[in-house]
Amino acid sequence: MDPSLVLEQTIQDVSNLPSEFRYLLEEIGSNDLKLIEEKKKYEQKESQIHKFIRQQGSIPKHPQEDGLDKEIKESLLKCQSLQREKCVLANTALFLIARHLNKLEKNIALLEEDGVLAPVEEDGDMDSAAEASRESSVVSNSSVKKRRAASSSGSVPPTLKKKKTSRTSKLQNEIDVSSREKSVTPVSPSIEKKIARTKEFKNSRNGKGQNGSPENEEEDKTLYCFCQRVSFGEMVACDGPNCKYEWFHYDCVNLKEPPKGTWYCPECKIEMEKNKLKRKRN
């Protein structure tokens, strides 16, 4: 593989990104303007009701209160819809970057393996956001099997670095794992399947575990979620049996807190609905 060809191909691949980003940002800006207008509408109607209550008291009902309430709810629903559209547009932009970046990183790795490109020497003292994002530590497939085996025997490993054992937490960089280690309540396999699983992925910059010894877990470079990036921060697992993404970043699926019960990603929900329709037709 020729580095010059890789560079040329990468430049060609990203040549349309500026126009694509311009369109996405214009759409987000347009939705922002619509949001402002809708907000003005429902705030105006709310002020009418509050003004009447201040003048007449809370006992008498505003003559147009039912109509105003209906219009306020419609405006709020419209705002919610616009916000969702903005999230989809923003995630689309993120996906475009992640896709091109992932392809570039794979090509760089191939060039390094072929010996035509010198590996990048990482400075242990460098404290940049780029380094932190590339060093995000995730669990390997072997650790998943170990955790499942422990769960079947009625116990759960105490460390939060095992996959699918932590309910909630935040991304942490350069911390002492022992100071943040939390206990986990044992969960039986039957109950575990019914719980929407969430996971925290930590990054230990110095590569040491609780006792200062090198970590035995291999770095998992598997790509998850719609954005096709590695695991980091707060993530939730899809309970769909055939989900091709498995894990999702909270921001990519518009989650702020762990879902209760089983949770399915948008694609699995659509697939489930299709299967229901097929069964009804048959």
Swiss-Prot record:
GO terms for cellular component: cytosol; NuA4 histone acetyltransferase complex; nucleosome; nucleus; piccolo histone acetyltransferase complex. Residues 129-143 have a biased composition (Low complexity). The modification Phosphothreonine is found at residue 185. Its main location: nucleus. One of its GO terms (molecular function) is histone H3K4me3 reader activity. It holds the Pfam family PHD. It comes from the Eukaryota. Residues 35-86 form a coiled coil. The keyword Glycosyltransferase does not apply. Residues 204-214 have a biased composition (Polar residues). One of its GO terms (biological process) is DNA-templated transcription. It is found in: Nucleus. SMART domains: ING, PHD. The PHD-type zinc finger mediates the binding to H3K4me3. Component of the NuA4 histone acetyltransferase complex which is involved in transcriptional activation of selected genes principally by acetylation of nucleosomal histone H4 and H2A. The NuA4 complex is also involved in DNA repair. Involved in cell cycle progression and meiosis. This is Chromatin modification-related protein YNG2. It comes from Saccharomyces cerevisiae (strain ATCC 204508 / S288c). The gene is YNG2.
